[in-house]
Structure formats: C-alpha cells, structure tokens
Amino acid sequence: MFAVVALGDMSEIELKVYHNVVKAREARALRDEVQRGIQTYGLVLVPKYGYIYAYEVDGFGHAILTDDANIPSLLAAPYFGYTMPNDRYYENTRRFLLSQDNPSFYQGHVARGIGSYHTPEHYIWPLALIVEGMTATSGAEKQDVLGQLLASDPGDHLLHESFNPDNPQQFTRRSFGWPNALFSEFVITQFEGDPGIPMGDTSDLEFRSE
C-alpha cells in the first residue's frame, strides 16, 4: 500500500520537477500494477468481517491476517494516503485489527491495542494506538485513545516503544522519539483548540534531545 502511494508521488515528481515523461509513466505503471495485485490477491473473505486486507499473502491462497504496530501498516492506510477511513474494505480491516481475532491485539486494565512480534507478548505499541486515533472517524474514539496514551505514562512523561497494558511501568526502549513525535502530530491535528483535552499541568515536562 505504501508503495502505491510512494510510486504515485514519484510519478508526480518525475513529471512536475524533472519533466521526465518516460520515468513518470514507468512509475505510474508500476504503481498501477502493485495496486491491481493488492486488490486481486490481498483481499480475504473473513467471517464476521467480510473482505479485509491481509497483512501478507504467498500467491498460493494462503494469507496472514494480522498487522504490525509500526508505520506503514494496514491500520495506517488512510494516514499515509492509500485509502479513505470510510472505505468499506478498510473499515472491515480496521474492525478485525482492533479485535481479539487479531493475534497481535492485546487488552489490559490500562489500555488495549496492537503489539508486535518484535517486543514481549501482550505488550502494545503507542505508535499503533496513535494511528488508531489519527484514523478514527469519531471524536469519542479519538478521546478514548488519548486517554489510554496518557494513562500509559510510567512517570517520565514519555511514550515508549511498547508497554504492558496492565502495568505501564513495564516498557521497552526508554528513549524512543518516534511515538513522541507522532503523539504531537496527533494532538495538534486532531485536538487543536479543543478545551476538553485532558492534558493537565504540563509545566514540569522535560524535553531531551538524546
């Protein structure tokens, strides 16, 4: 999916910046080929959900139905411009990914969300939580995600790679700038000017560059 978007951007750059019609056409043709492949082989019919996008297919009829907590991901498809949040296949995929039917979805007392095979089992990733919020279509879901992210703070006012949703004091990678940067984008783009954000007093926040 990300390749489809990137190749479309590449085609536009080749045409408008470098005025290279041939390269623009090649990039566009490859984009269209990848898109046809996704729509032909990447959609899998799943009971309860309908057709959803598979995380991986092998060309022989087998599919892995899950998602990765990083970006790009299936959940992040509207965020990076592949589709719209109200696309029916994306909506079906999203419902599956944010359910117990997704083997990488975990739920605890503090938060629930998508984890990764790269981190301990049952740990969820703030990155995936933020993407859930940024692709949500309702204010209530955005607020819910924001509340979970704030509740995941172990006391250092930072988001980490992953955390135990039953005990945020247990986390991986103390210094991990990516989710903190994306969290800023989430708040600015989704909540700017909203007086209902439960941000509390931020006067004691520490900003470090390491």
Question: Can you annotate each of these PLM segments?
Answer:
Residues M1-V5, K16-A128:
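Extended ligand-binding clefts on enzyme/binding-domain cores
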Residues I64-M84, H122-E210:
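C-terminal capping/lid segments that line or modulate ligand- or cofactor-binding pockets
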Residues L7-M10:
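The core hydrophobic/aromatic register in alpha-helical repeat solenoids, strongest
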